[in-house]
């Protein structure tokens, strides 16, 4: 029973780390990366469709993305969706392909992005600590129900704390790497 609680806590903590990593990946660095446009929705024949379902996103060079639209009639809808996104990008049309030059980040903008990334990391840490709290309270419920001993509770609390420390360390490593990436000129 306690093993299931610990296993579940470890899985949930892993998911928290993955979610934090995905949130941080959305923060724009100076480099072009196809995942930068993952959050963009295109109005395609009256329905909102993810950009990656109506176009192929690729990297042309370190500062330029290329978007090849599958259906030529949707080029303007894709262009409009990219321009109206909060990424501050201006696509240039070249036939069935849109070229998106990424403007260089200013020092002030980089610092803003670092604040956003640190906030995401803190949210990830909080989520992991919430998982720890839930796991420990589940184990204590078992103790109250006389399903395990006090020693088992203490041992499992220590193990859950080790999982927590390891996962928070992973988030800190991801944060440090992202900060370095953001400060590169």
Curated annotation (Swiss-Prot):
One of its GO terms (cellular component) is cytosol. Coiled coil: none annotated. One of its GO terms (biological process) is cytoplasmic translational termination. Keywords: Cytoplasm, Protein biosynthesis. InterPro entries: Ribosome_recyc_fac (IPR002661), Ribosome_recyc_fac_dom (IPR023584), RRF_sf (IPR036191). It is found in: Cytoplasm. One of its GO terms (molecular function) is ribosomal large subunit binding. Disulfide bonds: none annotated. Its main location: cytoplasm. Belongs to the RRF family. Responsible for the release of ribosomes from messenger RNA at the termination of protein biosynthesis. May increase the efficiency of translation by recycling ribosomes from one round of translation to another. This is Ribosome-recycling factor. The lineage of its organism: Bacteria, Pseudomonadati, Pseudomonadota, Gammaproteobacteria, Alteromonadales.
């Amino acid at each position: 029973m306690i093993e299931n609680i610990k296993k579940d806590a470890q899985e949930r903590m892993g998911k928290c780390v993955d979610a934090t990593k995905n949130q941080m990946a959305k923060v724009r660095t100076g480099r072009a990366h196809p995942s930068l446009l993952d959050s963009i929705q295109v109005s395609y024949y009256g329905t909102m469709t993810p950009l990656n379902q109506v176009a192929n996103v690729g990297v042309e060079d370190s500062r330029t993305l290329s978007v090849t639209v599958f259906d030529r009639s949707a080029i303007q809808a894709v262009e409009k969706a990219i321009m109206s996104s909060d990424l501050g990008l201006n696509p240039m049309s070249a036939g069935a392909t849109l070229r998106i030059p990424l403007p260089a980040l200013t020092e002030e903008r980089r610092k803003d992005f670092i604040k956003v990334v640190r906030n995401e990391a803190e949210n990830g840490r909080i989520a992991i600590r919430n998982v720890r709290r839930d796991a420990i309270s589940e184990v204590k419920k078992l103790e109250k129900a006389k399903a395990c001993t006090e020693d088992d509770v203490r041992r499992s609390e220590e193990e859950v704390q080790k999982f927590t420390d390891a996962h928070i360390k992973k988030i800190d490593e991801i944060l440090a790497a992202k900060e370095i990436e953001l400060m590169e000129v």
